[in-house]
Amino acid sequence: MTKADLIVGIQWGDEGKGKIVDMLSQNYDVVCRSGGGHNAGHTIWVDGMRYALHLVPSGILHKNIINIIGNGVVVNPEVLISEMAQFDHLEGRFFISDRAHLNLAHHSLIDQAKERLKGDKAIGTTGKGIGPAYSDKISRSGHRVGELLDPKALCESLMKDFESNKPYFDALSIEIPPKDKILADLVRFKDVLAPFITNTTELLWRAMDDNKKVLLEGAQGTLLDIDHGTYPYVTSSNTVSAGACTGLGLSPKSIGKVIGIIKAYSTRVGNGAFPTEDLGSDGENLCEIGKEFGTTTGRKRRCGWLDVVGIKYSSRLNGVDTYALMKLDVLDGFKNVKICKAYEYKGEVIDYFPSDLQNATPIYEELEGWDSINGIKKYEDLPLNARKYIERIEELTGVKIGFISTSPERNDTIVR
């Protein structure tokens, strides 16, 4: 039986996982998504064409690869159907777990209403209903994708839920659509999605028993993990490597190589602690050059320098074997670049990631910048200062950088 390799984001998401998954997936037979929902987004550039994926695994761009949405994902059928429409001939190469939970229209309404009520204490969620969908799952009142196969029964169950929760919906000023509209939507979802709904855990086990090569595609980033991230400014699922096991039905022994994706600088969407955020011209330049606007929301990302303390923390949580360093070309032309190698925290210098990160101040090491690396494909062709930056990251983290992205294009990647 083969083991599954895993790609996981090491920062606050948006590291560039999609490009690496797309590049590596041609070497695999199966690509799986294990958690999150359409709040996550991968942007992939192929031959000048931009693909924005939110639920469908990135392996979908390769027609000989099986793609699986696992039980740990919360699935918005409307979004999924829209995304599937971009691709031809999905039968036999795309599957959705019947155990995955549904993220329906009322979940988004709840999400947005609760954020409004929080005012300046808002988390900064995407408003896509992810938290409420996971809340229903954990409180054992959610509904699963497999229930779409009987839309009438699902509709009746939903109407009972809405009736029992009417005071809650009224308090949030949420108006539930009429029953006939809900049923019509559920029937439409079933008509499109039924051929793809199956027991994906068994499907995955059979593939691994047959020695098929499997790649697990992480969503978002480790520092957004519900347990290990910067709580409460986190997502509602486990984004660490262990979450891939529960989100697909795999044992920890099933995991092979873990590839950690790190961006050459740091970004964050929404609120929460961000020690290396740069509010000056460097931060603005990183945002503009890196086109740091959310794939899902279009929101401008907060930008700053690389935080090695957070990277080391995430790497231990995930058992990272090697890194892929993304968007190194965005640093082209900076006179100097910075790496945060420690924090000043409550009068001490620390090199660990505290639970109250808002009280940490970065301690920087400054390195000389470099000219353009755009499109370079050999490590020895990189400017000396770019190589020094890469090697300093390796020294500080103790992990080798095996992949280096030098442009958004799939083929502009150095493999070491």
From Swiss-Prot:
SMART domains recorded: Adenylsucc_synt
Principal location: cytoplasm
Cofactor: binding details: Binds 1 Mg(2+) ion per subunit.
Positions contributing to GTP binding: 13-19, 41-43, 301, 327-329, 405-407
Active site positions: 14, 42
Residues noted as binding substrate in the record, renumbered to the chain: 295-301
Family designation: Belongs to the adenylosuccinate synthetase family.
Subunit structure: Homodimer.
Identification of the protein by name: Adenylosuccinate synthetase
Organism expressing this protein natively: Campylobacter fetus subsp. fetus (strain 82-40)
Taxonomy of the source species: Bacteria, Pseudomonadati, Campylobacterota, Epsilonproteobacteria, Campylobacterales
